[in-house]
A protein has these predicted regions:
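Predominantly soluble domains enriched in secretory-pathway, periplasmic, or organellar proteins
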Residues: 1-424
């Protein structure tokens, strides 16, 4: 069947490809069953120090490049893409137009020397990142090291929860709590609390005090609007803690060993831990998925997948499907058997059972997924296939690959995102 007959959509997709040092952007236009690929002009490398390189913010409605100067904090819009612009890790606030850009600091100390000296690293907040009206709102110094972000907000079951941003700090073993309600001017985009994740009894050295830095190594941070709690995974201790956003206190602690990250289902009912077993079998990496029920406080679902290392996770618009991309990990012998090009699709309506309904082999690892949604339903899913420089287009209902589009030269990293869409 002709792809245009199967799903008569007109869409424009942006495709970033890079090698962690330099990159470029292609634009994929699909209309009337035909696809055209164009490339943004490239600006030579800036040759600036790493912390001074321009930060890539997004693209405008007119396909111009939005950049943030990390020194002057000015937003610049231009037609060309600086080859060494930094594609920072971004977390989007689900209830506003604000995006949060993570700065993990330098590798040696975890400090953002430009903004925070030797006192930590930072997050920067920009509004309207897909518009020529993009606005820089501020840079906030937090703890040191790699960050993750979660955003709390009021819901029907937790109406008193405030709008707050939680930022985990890997090297410090802390969480920075930041006001995220512009109506509360005194706290807005300011650190209002720091949560020390130390568990003294699990520290190999120390005097039993609540030390920071510590070995909590937080990596896995989510908010459930159903329970009204924040869930943080302490990788160093093998525990998951529950935080009350009304007072930022740790109110529960659960053993949760063998996991390296968390994600939460769109309805907030289940927190899913993902991890990998590289020790029990010298020839195989075994992916691990554990389903924690926020209402019962139990873990009723556990799944293992041989020769899989989970990379990124995504949900469809309905919240009925989970998509997991895969990557490389393990010893050379284990990597011989690893399915690094797999895209796994699960039926979330079967939870707490992790029901796998489709496995695609894309030919290489997916760099990212993007979703075309209509009236609250996912019509198409796009996978940026980094090493091949292609995009796989997947039907959101049948889960079948509709077509694969050649976009650019392959590279180690890629990211695709939707710029516009409508039905023809």
């Amino acid at each position: 069947m002709n792809p245009a007959d199967r799903n008569p959509m007109k869409y424009t997709l942006a495709y970033y490809t890079g090698n962690r040092k330099t990159g470029r952007i292609a634009i994929v236009d699909h209309a009337n069953g035909e696809t055209q690929v164009s490339h943004l002009a490239i600006e030579p490398e800036s040759n600036l120090e790493k912390e001074c390189k321009p930060v890539f913010v997004g693209l405008t409605e007119g396909r111009e490049v939005i950049l943030l100067d990390p020194v002057s904090k000015e937003i610049r819009v231009q037609p060309s893409f600086p080859e060494d612009a930094f594609p920072a890790h971004i977390y989007s606030d689900p209830n506003s137009s604000r995006d949060w850009f993570m700065n993990d600091g330098d590798k040696e100390t975890g400090n953002d020397r430009l903004n925070c000296g030797d006192q930590g690293s930072s997050v920067s907040v920009v509004a309207d990142t897909s518009s020529s009206a993009a606005a820089y709102l501020g840079t906030i110094c937090v703890g040191r090291g790699h960050h993750q972000a979660a955003f709390t907000y009021p819901s029907d079951s937790a109406p008193q929860v405030p709008h707050t941003a939680y930022i985990s700090n890997l090297k410090d073993g802390t969480i920075s709590v930041i006001g995220n309600d512009p109506r509360q001017a005194g706290d807005y985009l300011k650190v209002v609390a720091t949560i020390n994740l130390c568990e003294p009894e699990k520290e190999k050295e120390g005097d039993g005090s609540m030390a920071a830095p510590n070995n909590a190594f937080p990596h896995g941070l989510v908010y459930s609007p159903l329970s009204g709690k924040v869930y943080n995974l302490n990788n160093g201790y093998g525990t998951m803690v529950l935080i009350d956003p009304l007072n930022h206190a740790i109110v529960e602690r659960h053993d949760f060993k063998g996991h390296s990250n968390l994600f939460v289902t769109p309805d907030g009912r289940y927190v899913i831990g993902r991890g990998a077993d590289r020790k029990s079998d010298p020839r195989h990496v075994i992916a691990r998925l554990s389903v924690f029920d926020v209402l019962s406080g139990e873990t009723p679902g556990r799944t293992e997948l041989r020769d899989i290392y989970i990379s990124k996770y995504y949900f469809n618009a309905q919240g009925s499907k989970l998509y997991l991309t895969t990557g490389k990990s393990g010893t050379p012998e284990q990597q011989k058997n690893l399915k690094t090009d797999a895209l796994l699709i699960f039926d979330l309506t079967a939870l707490p059972e992790m029901k796998l309904i489709k496995e695609h082999r894309l030919g290489c690892s997916s760099g990212s997924l993007a979703f075309l949604n209509e009236d609250g339903r996912t019509s198409l899913v796009f996978s940026s296939n980094s090493e091949q420089g292609t995009v796989s287009v997947i039907d959101g209902e049948s889960d079948e690959i509709v077509e694969t589009l050649a976009v650019t030269e392959g590279a180690s990293h890629s990211r695709a995102w939707l710029l516009s869409s409508h039905r023809e």
